[in-house]
Amino acid sequence: MSESILIVIFFFFSFLIIAENGPHLLVEAEQAKVFSHRGGNVTLPCKFYRDPTAFGSGIHKIRIKWTKLTSDYLKEVDVFVSMGYHKKTYGGYQGRVFLKGGSDSDASLVITDLTLEDYGRYKCEVIEGLEDDTVVVALDLQGMYL
């Protein structure tokens, strides 16, 4: 290899290392806890923000994954996964969950016809290439007042 090609390769990989430092994806929830009642509908909030100036931003499809955390936090149960036009719903959530889709950066999950088993903590994970971030949202039962 010529010396000029080696120099170009060196600078290219140096640029990759510099460009990849620091997070370029941030996931947030407007509320850490939401309330609803049995049989009702609820939106679990989740929004993500990308750094459009980051190297490689926008070349990978965004993958959104929602899981429910078990009460001991040792296991995650798959609820919903979306990547582009591809979507998959798991278990008892089939036909009852979908992404709100208010904007391109909205990963909020809508759950309809809530059951007692739906209450608990949910994790929203957004993945773009090698970058990922998560947020946890609690779904609690709304009390009934007489």
Give, region by region, the residue ranges found by the protein language model:
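N-terminal Sec-dependent signal peptide, specifically the hydrophobic helical h-region
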Residues: 1-40
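Flexible inter-domain hinge/linker segments at boundaries of tandem extracellular adhesion modules
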Residues: 13-28, 67-72, 90, 103, ...
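Extracellular ectodomain surface segments
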Residues: 30-58, 62
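Amphipathic alpha-helical protein-protein interaction segments
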Residues: 35-37, 55, 86, 100, ...
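Structured beta-strand/turn binding interfaces of compact recognition modules in eukaryotic regulators
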Residues: 39, 45-49, 67-69, 100, ...
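Short, conserved beta-strand segments of beta-strand-rich sandwich/propeller modules, principally
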Residues: 43, 63, 119-123
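N-terminal V-set
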Residues: 49-94
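Ligand-binding face of N-terminal immunoglobulin V-set domains in extracellular IgSF glycoproteins
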Residues: 94-138
